[in-house]
Amino acid sequence: IVGKEGAFKKVMENLFKIGSAGTAIELRTVLTKKNALDLPELANFISKHLGFINKWVIMAMEPIGFAKANKDELFYDHSIARFPLHNALDIASLNGVNVQLYNFPLCTVDKKYRKYCTKSISDWKNKYIDECSTCEKQNSCCGFFEWYTQDWKWLNIKPIN
């Protein structure tokens, strides 16, 4: 994804060095249109080769900077195209990988997978949109980034009641 020759090899070498030193590793993957369909394969890879990591975090994209400027190429609506994400969570979980979801509003993930969601957006950059006003899960939901706008909207947002 970074498009740099040798980047994967370098990352793997450094992960193994850090892991062998006993350092806690939180591996983060930002969900994008470019990697969404490969997420189950990545879950298999992490399960087989990176068992020493402490946590694998899959993050919904924050609508700022490069992501915002390249929305059409990067934004992936996991609320309607759920299979890759859910499949990856199943694979990771079945293989003992501690996996969590950051920046995923609870209503955008099937009920079975909400246990992976974390209230991950800092208070100072967090907001709840109109659809959240009647949601019973608002207190345990990460909500949305302050700069989240209607043109960056997941299609399947609805209150959980």
What are these regions (language model features)?
Residues 1-59:
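Radical SAM/AdoMet-radical enzyme domain recognition
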Residues 7-9, 45-48, 75-78, 118-122, ...:
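Short, low-complexity, polar/charged sequence segments that are solvent-exposed and flexible
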Residues 10, 39, 68, 100, ...:
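Short linear functional motifs in flexible/disordered or boundary regions
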Residues 13, 42, 71, 103, ...:
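Residue-level detector of alpha-helical recognition elements and their boundaries
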Residues 24, 36-38, 55, 61-133, ...:
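A C-terminal junction/extension of Radical SAM enzymes
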Residues 125-161:
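Radical SAM enzyme core and accessory elements
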